[in-house]
Amino acid sequence: MMPDMQQVGQAQTQQWAPEINAPVVLLENVSKTYGKIHALSEITLALSGGVTGILGMNGAGKSTLFNLLMGKLKPSSGSIKLFGTDPWKNPAPYAKIGFVPEHEKMHDWMTAHGFVSLFARLNGLTRDEARVEADRVLDFVGLTDVAHKQIGRYSKGMRQRVKIAHALVNDPDLIVLDEPLQGCDPLARTTIMNVIRELGKMGRTVLVSSHILHEIERITEQIVILHNGRLLALGNLHAIREKMDNIPHTISIGCENPKELAKDIINNNAVYGISFPRSDNLQVQTHNLNEVHRELPSLIVENGHIVNSIDNPDDDLESILNYLTGGFVS
């Protein structure tokens, strides 16, 4: 989506090209305030290539960040550069962005092919070029077989894929997806995750927001964590988890004989507590999650235990936020 041109000013008339070696997205001390409310506070980050998960609870600032990147909002302070260019001085970089908004605004009476073709025409393609491009992007998201059916007959997951397809008609180098998995069934989630991963493998810079940790984990380990408008973490999710190894964790194990399994697990030096919440469940308390998980498979097999599930109930986004904020998550 293009910004309000009256706010941006006149586009530069000279030919534009991305700055070589510049980050695709660069924010320097960016803040956005509404009166006394700080939606984002002094965010600095640089992103280029591959998939990055933008994590945060509701109200963390994810949508505000995306609206700033898309030019729908202007920073209260700080600077934003896309492909090395300040888009508020020259809006040309917006032509290289594809945006998938959280909310649906599609015409249910249109076919997916007609809807996507329309956006291709709006990007300057001829009628024939738009048809070819619509075929290409709908095939990429796996909707070729139903491309000429009305969108109103689509499931939630199919509608989400139409939104992704329409964001790809300009062959963007930066793709921004706001909560693309929300409301989708498991099969649709897997399909959309595969599409997002494929875009990352193609070298595109992909930003995907979510408030659900395991969704992002299935797509990428490169994350940005926002909380109350502030940047809490930027980097590899695995590295953040390693830093959390010295704090208490719970492992929940569904099994046929919890007490027999407990006799073997309690010998692990990293285990400091055992409990039996149900007749088919064992809960293990540990200060070293990785060590226990490393030993569990061989311990289970060698001793003939029948295990149905292994889960970490406290290994979620809220736990990471508690760790990063010292337990002061509000």
Sequence positions of predicted segments:
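Conserved ABC transporter NBD signature motif
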Residues: 78-93
